Amino acid sequence: MKKAVILLNMGGPSSLLEVDMFLKNMFNDPRILPIKSPFFRSLVASFIANRRSETAKANYRKIGGKSPLIGHTFNLIQKLQSLDPSRFYTYAMRYTPPMTDMAVRELAQKEIEEVTLFSLYPQYSTTTTLSSIEEFHKQCALLSYFPKTKEIDRYFEDSNYNEAIIDRILEALGGDNPEEFTLIFSAHGLPQSVIDAGDPYEKEVHANIQALTKLLEERGITFKKITHAYQSKVGPMKWLEPSLDEVLKLHAKEKILLYPIAFTLDNSETDFELRIEYQEKATHLGITDYRVASCLNDSTRFAHAIIKLISQGEIS
């Protein structure tokens, strides 16, 4: 039986020419902008995208004119394929090429009979994980392609995954004393209304932090303090709290090590928002040592964790 694994993520522009596409596709997603009428949602999405276009392009210019996410994803695929040639590995992005329809068409052409959907979001959310999974099944139906499927839609409590995160945290410390640092686990924010409607994201972020805190204790790694924050708030609605701005103000003049807990791959919100925008805010607050740990990207330990999760969830 021919088996494949498809990594699911939101995507990001590969050039400045794709920024408008990325914004319009994202805000036209009913899981992001819950307007029932496709026509009116499309109008609102275009309006929001047009308002944000120039600012977004300016931000991307500061990190090389593109999102690093596509490159990291490709490198991870190469690593997985070399470690596990028994399966075909590919990926699908929700809002930019290579999009889900392209990936599904490739799987159908290869006559893949069994597909594991692997979310690159470690915690489950309707706005991210579910959106990507729904799109996969929609595109399969359009092609009348119905392979056996298995979904790995969260793995925030997996010990192998969390050990890979500890490795990244230690790399960022670089041998310095962790007791001198406040460790902040920063997660992408969501509107409070999404959580109130039953989305499990906030609970799973907290559970992930608890699992990592326990692992740090078991390994004898002690920080001055461990806390959490939410980043990337947009608009006037109430979002998850505390915000990263608030948490940094509380720890002004301290040494800060930040880990982006909601991301497995570095992207514009780590490379620009955390490493550039918040670096400037940290400096303004008197934080003289501000560090952002790298995401897992194509680390060998992360790749092995993915393969093990897939093997454990193998379709019988």
Swiss-Prot record:
Its EC number(s): 4.98.1.1
UniProt-listed NCBIfam families: hemH (TIGR00109)
Binding site for Fe cation: H188, E269
Family designation: Belongs to the ferrochelatase family.
Subcellular location: Cytoplasm
Keywords, alphabetical: Cytoplasm, Heme biosynthesis, Iron, Lyase, Metal-binding, Porphyrin biosynthesis
Organism expressing this protein natively: Wolinella succinogenes (strain ATCC 29543 / DSM 1740 / CCUG 13145 / JCM 31913 / LMG 7466 / NCTC 11488 / FDC 602W) (Vibrio succinogenes)
Gene Ontology biological-process annotations: heme biosynthetic process
Protein name, UniProt field: Ferrochelatase
Gene Ontology CC entries for this record: cytoplasm
Reported function: Catalyzes the ferrous insertion into protoporphyrin IX.
Enzyme class: lyase
Principal subcellular localisation of the protein: cytoplasm
Pfam families membership: Ferrochelatase
Pathway where this protein functions: Porphyrin-containing compound metabolism; protoheme biosynthesis; protoheme from protoporphyrin-IX: step 1/1
The reaction(s) this protein catalyses: heme b + 2 H(+) = protoporphyrin IX + Fe(2+)
Stored InterPro entries: Ferrochelatase, Ferrochelatase_AS, Ferrochelatase_C, Ferrochelatase_N
PANTHER family: FERROCHELATASE, FERROCHELATASE, MITOCHONDRIAL
Gene (name only): hemH
GO molecular function: ferrochelatase activity; metal ion binding
